[in-house]
A protein has these predicted regions:
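N-terminal glycine-rich flavin-associated loop
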Residues: 666-679, 721-728, 768-770
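Short amphipathic beta-strand starts and helix->beta connectors
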Residues: 445, 509, 654-661, 706-716, ...
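Residues forming the flavin
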Residues: 2-613, 764, 979
Length: 1001
């Protein structure tokens, strides 16, 4: 039976609306307005999760988006389930189901908790050190390390919810609805600015809305009462739009911001049907006012992570907002006045406070004196040295601090408690400010970073600007607004203010302990289990940059992005390394500020891409003949043609044998085709390709290689001269659009003097390739009035012809190494001509083949595929294609780069053939190639680019790139795989018919 810690009053909850929900399979009750965190605390549930590395028990620590511990899984169905959700931001609804993450079999008994006992083996960077020996065991270690990675479970079914995007334009965007944000929004709206006010919470007012003691007054009213009236007034303003439950995720340049508006997450699931869940707001504002507030800092001391340890401000909010006591025996631990505000609020509600520990020795504070009137014991100049209790704190130990704060002295005092509130000061929430390009400065007096240089048309006000007390905010905000909005006065000039906060603070980043050095666990990052000891270890091991320490220790790399711990990490680095905090800088604040669902990012752009599928004129024939398809760029290309129960390997073996032994037919319509005309067409090709084109005769074809300006292979294809000033160029399928754009760019910007006209005709023609020993016999039947003799129609030539009354072009070119012809005909006749070829080849067992067989056939011949056997680092020389680079031409694109010292190195990766010792063993494409697996570290020489089993050679073949490969012919190399090492021999990349006898047969 759980306790009920609900108080009689709570500002935001509706006690007439009772809600049942489940957590870890148990049913609890809360009220409308509760968050999951407040409802669990009301039911005396503090243990909600386990930490990432050590699986230590973790409890609710905050009341907002900075929560590092209470990260839960929502829903239990496979489509709507959502991991890593902060319980502090989940508004409960009827039949809500939530569960703890990162624990098994349960949060109360987690087998992973054994990690805590082995923590000496798991320090910062343990994955680089602890499990490195013996090396042969790494694969065993790796399995368990990977298995333990991650927190929650991702959905496995399609998301049933609806998401939208919306564009908003406004004169002034105000981020945050605390007291400064309300003042800014009202002032802007009343001065004629179209204003948008957004806040991540469901209610307006920030923390001031529950600052209701006599020690904080505005115009002789409690600050909360005054603010409530202001909120009621701004809701009536016509040119002010207010959006709650709206979190600004990203702040980009020129005042473009992304915000997520949460519309239905607080509703029961059955009420969400047909409604938009989240809306991604794309906001463009003329001016932006950041009033994002500040985040309370925890304290770093030994065992500061137990369930029941919360931020002092969170305890206050749960009491004031939700009517929840976080414990029955409360202790507060502080270094500033904020904890006394909490104490006064708890006293007013009858909540017991056992003691307050204040590490300041002398405090002159009205708030402290008020607390002392209630006979609450205050330990001045003390610190918490340890806490006790496994699943919930039950006791603390305290000791007096030395004068310099570096040690503890005197006797230990034990105090029992079930809740410890900590307050280590406040950190301005500058995350969005820095995303916008703003620059920070370090303020020594309160050891914090505040905005310094603002981008144009942006202003930071209130606590996020370093004004951390009520009187500072109320005095500075009107002046900032007058300057920023270019107005003469505001209604907030000359407010009467009572603010009793004493700004004195004793900041000690790492509080001392009475334990032996190194035996403590003082947590800096609660979610990732990064401790002060880890940070010091990183410094001892040579890390100095805050970004390096962050990554080595994983500090600030959890779902909370270090909102609580990063300042402490900086402070500990500063003290340990003897560096000034202002000189250390901060880690980079990256969007999103709080996590976004993929649904929010995608919006309505779900299902198939709007990007079209392109189909060849022969596509319907491929479908009728049961072809399997693959996507090549936008094209659907026939991949292979299985017969009966053939798998891909069997089909490809059959197709490739047929193409070599008799005849094969390929739909090559997807190749890019560019019609090139103009008096300077030949000169244009000379500049574009590496080889010479001026003397290419009409009716002849030539293979060309196109480079980038850096000398690296960009594309390839065959270009045919149709007339004196008329060519047709083919490109790779995937590169067609890019090549067309690149050529147009050169014509328009680099060579405008050339008279050349380019037209993309890819879709105009169907291209049918017939190859094999019987190809001539087949095309002779299809085009009987054309002379196909070798004398009349040699390799790399073309002829105009007619099939019936339809004009076509026939090229004798080959991508297989076989005697081959390509028929190019107007697209509408493509399928008809294909069927004629199939009919003509029936007696020769003509076999259609797809892209997979095409790849195998060209690899047997050593022909490259740009993008598979090349990347953006390969030159023609690397590909053993020196022959295609003209030595006579004055210039071509990329020529100068071919002679740089880097590109003429002999040890560059070069294309070679690879033959396995076991001819039946097929290498994996992408596999690394090494010479010596016993050398440490193993030197990677290259990788496999293409690999197949060749039925025509009865062995496996592969192409690869190897450093200095041209000079390694016949040498043995090794392909290290997961379970074995495969021995290979470096060979000529041309595996079949090097003399081209088949091509010219």
């Amino acid at each position: 039976m759980t306790k009920n810690l609900r108080l009689k009053t709570g500002k935001t909850i509706d006690e007439t609306y009772k809600i049942s929900f489940q957590f870890n399979g148990s049913t609890y009750y809360g009220f409308k307005g509760d968050t999951l965190a407040s409802a669990l605390l009301a039911n005396d549930v503090h243990l909600v999760g386990r930490s990432f590395k050590y699986h230590r028990p973790r409890g609710i620590m905050t009341a907002g988006s900075e929560e590092p511990n209470a990260i839960v899984q929502l829903h239990d169905n496979t489509s709507r389930t959502e991991p890593n959700v902060r319980a502090t931001e989940v508004e409960i609804y009827e039949r809500l189901k939530a569960s703890s993450q990162n624990c098994w079999p349960s949060v109360n008994f987690d087998i992973g908790g054994i990690n805590n006992f082995f923590s000496p083996l798991l320090p910062a960077g343990f994955y680089y050190k602890t499990f490195m020996w013996p090396a042969s065991f790494w694969e065993k270690y790796e399995y368990f390390i990977r298995k333990s990675a991650g927190l929650g479970k991702s959905p496995t079914q399609p998301d049933p919810d609806i998401y939208e995007h919306k564009y908003i334009h406004c004169d002034v965007l105000v981020i945050g609805s605390g007291i400064s944000g309300i003042m800014a929004a009202k002032t802007a709206a009343k001065n004629g600015f179209k204003t948008l006010l957004v806040d991540e919470k469901p209610n307006l007012g920030g923390s001031t809305i529950y600052q209701n003691s006599d020690y904080f007054k505005i115009n002789n009213q409690s600050s909360s009462s005054w603010l409530e009236k202001e909120i009621n007034e701004i809701k009536k303003l016509d040119n002010l739009e207010i959006k709650t439950r709206t979190s600004v995720a990203a702040y980009h340049g020129y005042n473009f911001l992304l915000a997520r508006e949460n519309l239905t997450d607080h509703l029961p699931v059955e009420q969400r049907k047909g409604k938009t869940r989240h809306k991604l707001l794309k906001i463009r504002a003329k001016k932006v006012i950041s009033a994002t507030g500040s985040i309370e800092r925890p304290m770093v001391f030994d065992n500061n992570d137990r369930p029941g340890i919360l931020l002092s401000s969170a305890i206050k909010k749960y009491a004031d907002f939700f009517g929840v006591a976080c414990g029955e025996k409360n202790i507060l631990f502080t270094n500033n006045d904020s904890a006394y505000e909490t104490a006064i609020s708890l006293i007013q509600k009858g909540i017991n406070i056992e003691a307050i520990i204040d590490n300041r020795e002398e405090v002159d504070s009205k708030l402290l004196y008020e607390v002392e009137k209630n006979n609450i014991k205050i330990f001045k100049g003390y610190t918490v040295t340890d806490t006790f209790g496994y699943k919930r704190i039950n006791k603390i130990s305290i000791k007096q601090l030395s004068k310099d704060g570096q040690n503890v002295v005197g006797s230990k005092i034990n105090l029992s408690c079930d809740c410890l509130g900590v307050s280590g000061g406040w950190t301005p929430a500058v995350h969005l400010f820095t995303q916008s390009g703003g620059k920070l400065k370090f303020r020594d007096e309160d050891q914090t970073f505040i905005p310094n240089t603002h981008p144009s048309d942006q202003l930071s006000i209130g606590a996020c600007n370093g004004d951390l007390t009520l009187d500072e905010i109320l005095k500075s905000t009107p002046n900032y607004l007058k300057g920023f909005l270019n107005i003469k006065n505001t209604e907030y000039d000359g407010l009467e203010i009572i603010s009793s906060t004493n700004k004195s603070k004793r900041n000690i980043w790492l509080l001392p302990s009475d334990k032996v050095l190194g035996k403590t666990k003082s947590f800096v990052d609660y979610q990732n289990d990064a401790t002060a000891k880890d940070i010091k270890l990183a410094l001892r091991e040579g890390f100095r940059s805050i970004e390096h320490v962050k990554r080595y220790t994983t500090t600030g790399m959890g779902t909370d992005q270090g909102k609580l711990g990063n300042m402490h990490a900086l402070g500990i680095i500063s003290e340990t390394a003897g560096a000034k905090m202002g000189e250390l800088g901060t880690t980079t604040f990256r969007p999103p500020y709080t996590p976004l669902t993929f649904g929010t990012i995608v919006g309505r752009n779900v299902g198939e891409y709007f990007d079209i599928f392109r189909k060849t004129p022969i596509h319907s024939w491929h479908e009728e003949n049961k072809a399997e398809f693959e996507n090549v760029g936008q094209w659907k290309r026939a991949w292979y043609y299985p017969i009966e129960n053939e798998n891909m390997h069997q089909a490809v073996q059959r197709e490739s044998k047929a193409a070599r032994e008799s005849a094969g037919i390929l739909d090559a319509s997807t190749l890019g085709k560019i019609d090139i005309q103009g008096t300077d067409a030949s000169e244009f090709l000379n500049r574009v390709y590496t080889n010479a084109w001026s003397k290419l005769a009409i009716g002849k074809c030539r293979y060309g290689l196109m480079l980038n300006e850096d000398g690296m292979v960009y594309d390839d294809g065959v270009t045919t001269r149709l007339g004196e000033n008329h060519y047709i160029m083919t490109t790779t399928t995937g590169g067609a659009a890019n090549v067309m754009g690149k050529l147009e760019d050169y014509l328009q910007t680099e060579w405008p003097e050339l008279e050349v006209y380019l037209t993309s005709v890819t879709d105009h023609y169907a291209t049918i390739s017939v190859c094999g020993p019987n190809s001539k016999k087949i095309v002779s039947k299809v085009i009987p009035n054309l002379d196909f003799s070798d004398e009349s129609f040699p390799h790399m030539s073309f002829k105009n012809a007619k099939i019936g009354n339809i004009n076509c072009r026939v090229m004798r070119i080959s991508f297989t190494g076989e005697h081959s012809y390509e028929i190019n005909i107007q697209a509408n006749y493509g399928k008809s001509v294909w069927e004629k070829c199939m009919e003509a080849g029936k007696n020769y067992n003509i076999t259609p083949y797809g892209t997979e067989t095409m790849h195998l056939l060209r690899a047997e011949k050593g022909f490259i595929i740009v993008g598979q056997d090349t990347d953006a680092t390969m030159t023609p020389i690397d590909l053993q294609m020196d022959w295609i680079v003209s030595k006579k031409k004055y210039d071509f694109i990329g020529k100068r780069s071919l002679y740089r010292s880097d590109t003429i190195r002999e040890d560059r990766k070069q294309l070679v053939g690879l033959l396995t010792d076991n001819p039946n063993e097929v290498l994996e494409e992408g596999a690394q190639i090494v010479a010596d697996i016993n050398k440490s570290p193993i030197e990677m020489l290259g990788h496999v680019t293409s690999s197949y089993y060749s039925p025509n050679l009865n062995k496996s073949i592969a192409l690869g790139v190897v450093r200095g490969g041209k000079n390694m012919m016949g040498q043995k190399l090794i392909i290290p795989m997961e379970k074995k090492n495969i021995n290979v021999t470096v060979a000529d990349p041309v595996f079949l018919d090097k003399e081209n006898k088949r091509l010219n047969a």
